[in-house]
Protein backbone atom coordinates (compact mmCIF):
# COMPACT_ATOMS: atom_id res chain seq x y z
CA UNK A 1 0.00 0.00 0.00
CA UNK A 2 2.87 2.38 0.80
CA UNK A 3 4.43 1.81 -2.62
CA UNK A 4 1.10 2.45 -4.34
CA UNK A 5 0.84 5.83 -2.61
CA UNK A 6 4.12 7.05 -4.17
CA UNK A 7 3.40 9.18 -7.21
CA UNK A 8 5.98 8.32 -9.86
CA UNK A 9 5.46 11.73 -11.48
CA UNK A 10 6.73 13.41 -8.31
CA UNK A 11 9.83 11.22 -8.25
CA UNK A 12 10.54 11.87 -11.94
CA UNK A 13 9.95 15.61 -11.59
CA UNK A 14 12.34 15.82 -8.66
CA UNK A 15 15.02 13.68 -10.31
CA UNK A 16 14.79 15.54 -13.60
CA UNK A 17 15.05 18.92 -11.89
CA UNK A 18 18.17 17.87 -9.99
CA UNK A 19 19.72 16.57 -13.20
CA UNK A 20 18.98 19.87 -14.94
CA UNK A 21 20.56 21.88 -12.13
CA UNK A 22 23.67 19.68 -12.17
CA UNK A 23 23.97 20.00 -15.95
CA UNK A 24 23.74 23.79 -15.77
CA UNK A 25 26.40 23.86 -13.07
CA UNK A 26 28.75 21.42 -14.84
CA UNK A 27 28.53 23.14 -18.22
CA UNK A 28 29.13 26.60 -16.77
CA UNK A 29 25.70 27.75 -17.90
CA UNK A 30 25.16 29.32 -14.47
CA UNK A 31 27.97 31.80 -15.11
CA UNK A 32 26.66 32.47 -18.61
CA UNK A 33 23.21 33.21 -17.19
CA UNK A 34 24.73 35.52 -14.56
CA UNK A 35 26.67 37.38 -17.25
CA UNK A 36 23.51 37.72 -19.34
CA UNK A 37 21.59 39.16 -16.37
CA UNK A 38 24.34 41.68 -15.60
CA UNK A 39 24.56 42.54 -19.30
CA UNK A 40 20.81 43.13 -19.50
CA UNK A 41 20.92 45.44 -16.48
CA UNK A 42 23.79 47.51 -17.87
CA UNK A 43 27.22 48.36 -16.55
CA UNK A 44 27.50 48.44 -12.75
CA UNK A 45 23.92 47.51 -11.85
CA UNK A 46 22.67 48.38 -8.41
CA UNK A 47 23.06 45.35 -6.09
CA UNK A 48 19.56 46.00 -4.75
CA UNK A 49 18.17 45.54 -8.27
CA UNK A 50 20.11 42.28 -8.57
CA UNK A 51 18.73 41.16 -5.20
CA UNK A 52 15.20 41.76 -6.49
CA UNK A 53 15.95 39.97 -9.77
CA UNK A 54 17.48 36.98 -7.97
CA UNK A 55 14.48 36.71 -5.65
CA UNK A 56 11.91 37.01 -8.44
CA UNK A 57 13.68 34.55 -10.76
CA UNK A 58 14.32 32.03 -7.97
CA UNK A 59 10.76 32.28 -6.74
CA UNK A 60 9.29 31.92 -10.23
CA UNK A 61 11.44 28.89 -11.04
CA UNK A 62 10.85 27.14 -7.73
CA UNK A 63 7.12 27.14 -8.32
CA UNK A 64 7.57 25.12 -11.51
CA UNK A 65 10.45 22.82 -10.60
CA UNK A 66 11.78 21.25 -7.42
CA UNK A 67 12.83 23.78 -4.78
CA UNK A 68 16.01 21.78 -4.12
CA UNK A 69 16.92 21.75 -7.80
CA UNK A 70 16.11 25.44 -8.17
CA UNK A 71 18.37 26.26 -5.24
CA UNK A 72 21.15 24.14 -6.73
CA UNK A 73 20.72 26.03 -10.00
CA UNK A 74 20.38 29.55 -8.59
CA UNK A 75 23.07 29.68 -5.87
CA UNK A 76 25.98 29.61 -8.36
CA UNK A 77 24.21 32.28 -10.43
CA UNK A 78 23.65 34.48 -7.35
CA UNK A 79 27.27 34.02 -6.30
CA UNK A 80 28.51 34.93 -9.79
CA UNK A 81 26.29 38.01 -9.84
CA UNK A 82 27.62 39.25 -6.51
CA UNK A 83 31.21 38.55 -7.53
CA UNK A 84 30.73 40.44 -10.82
CA UNK A 85 29.89 43.53 -8.73
CA UNK A 86 32.62 42.96 -6.17
CA UNK A 87 29.84 42.65 -3.59
CA UNK A 88 29.58 40.37 -0.58
CA UNK A 89 27.53 37.41 -1.85
CA UNK A 90 25.79 36.60 1.44
CA UNK A 91 22.65 38.69 0.80
CA UNK A 92 22.30 37.27 -2.71
CA UNK A 93 22.76 33.69 -1.52
CA UNK A 94 20.33 33.99 1.38
CA UNK A 95 17.77 35.72 -0.87
CA UNK A 96 18.18 32.82 -3.29
CA UNK A 97 17.64 30.20 -0.60
CA UNK A 98 14.57 31.98 0.75
CA UNK A 99 13.13 32.61 -2.73
CA UNK A 100 13.71 28.99 -3.72
CA UNK A 101 11.83 27.94 -0.59
CA UNK A 102 8.77 29.96 -1.66
CA UNK A 103 7.21 27.11 -3.62
CA UNK A 104 3.77 27.96 -2.29
CA UNK A 105 1.95 29.16 -5.41
CA UNK A 106 1.77 25.90 -7.37
CA UNK A 107 1.39 22.21 -6.61
CA UNK A 108 4.56 21.51 -8.60
CA UNK A 109 7.47 23.13 -6.78
CA UNK A 110 7.49 21.12 -3.60
CA UNK A 111 6.88 17.37 -3.32
CA UNK A 112 4.60 17.93 -0.31
CA UNK A 113 2.38 20.22 -2.40
CA UNK A 114 2.19 17.64 -5.17
CA UNK A 115 1.35 14.85 -2.74
CA UNK A 116 -1.67 16.60 -1.22
CA UNK A 117 -3.29 17.90 -4.43
CA UNK A 118 -5.38 14.79 -4.88
CA UNK A 119 -5.97 14.19 -1.20
CA UNK A 120 -7.34 17.67 -0.58
CA UNK A 121 -9.07 18.07 -3.92
CA UNK A 122 -7.10 21.28 -4.48
CA UNK A 123 -6.98 23.10 -7.78
CA UNK A 124 -4.03 25.03 -9.17
CA UNK A 125 -5.73 28.33 -8.33
CA UNK A 126 -6.04 27.29 -4.67
CA UNK A 127 -2.26 27.23 -4.42
CA UNK A 128 -2.00 30.60 -6.17
CA UNK A 129 -4.53 32.21 -3.81
CA UNK A 130 -2.81 30.89 -0.70
CA UNK A 131 0.76 31.15 -1.95
CA UNK A 132 1.07 34.62 -3.47
CA UNK A 133 0.48 36.51 -0.20
CA UNK A 134 3.12 34.35 1.52
CA UNK A 135 5.56 35.04 -1.30
CA UNK A 136 4.86 38.79 -1.10
CA UNK A 137 5.62 38.82 2.64
CA UNK A 138 8.84 36.84 2.11
CA UNK A 139 9.88 39.23 -0.68
CA UNK A 140 9.38 42.36 1.41
CA UNK A 141 11.19 40.90 4.43
CA UNK A 142 14.15 39.80 2.28
CA UNK A 143 14.50 43.04 0.37
CA UNK A 144 14.34 45.13 3.54
CA UNK A 145 16.37 43.01 5.97
CA UNK A 146 19.08 41.28 3.95
CA UNK A 147 20.99 44.42 2.89
CA UNK A 148 20.92 45.55 6.53
CA UNK A 149 22.04 42.20 7.95
CA UNK A 150 24.57 41.51 5.18
CA UNK A 151 25.64 44.79 3.52
CA UNK A 152 26.70 44.49 -0.11
CA UNK A 153 29.95 46.38 0.46
CA UNK A 154 32.31 46.66 3.40
Predicted features, each with a name:
Residues 1-6, 88-89, 152:
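Flexible hinge motifs at transmembrane-helix junctions and intramembrane kinks/re-entrant loops
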Amino acid sequence: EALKSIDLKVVLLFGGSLALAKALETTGAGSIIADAIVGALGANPNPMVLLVVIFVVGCALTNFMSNTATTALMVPIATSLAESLGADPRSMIIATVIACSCAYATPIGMPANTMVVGLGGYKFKDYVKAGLPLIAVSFVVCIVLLPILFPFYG
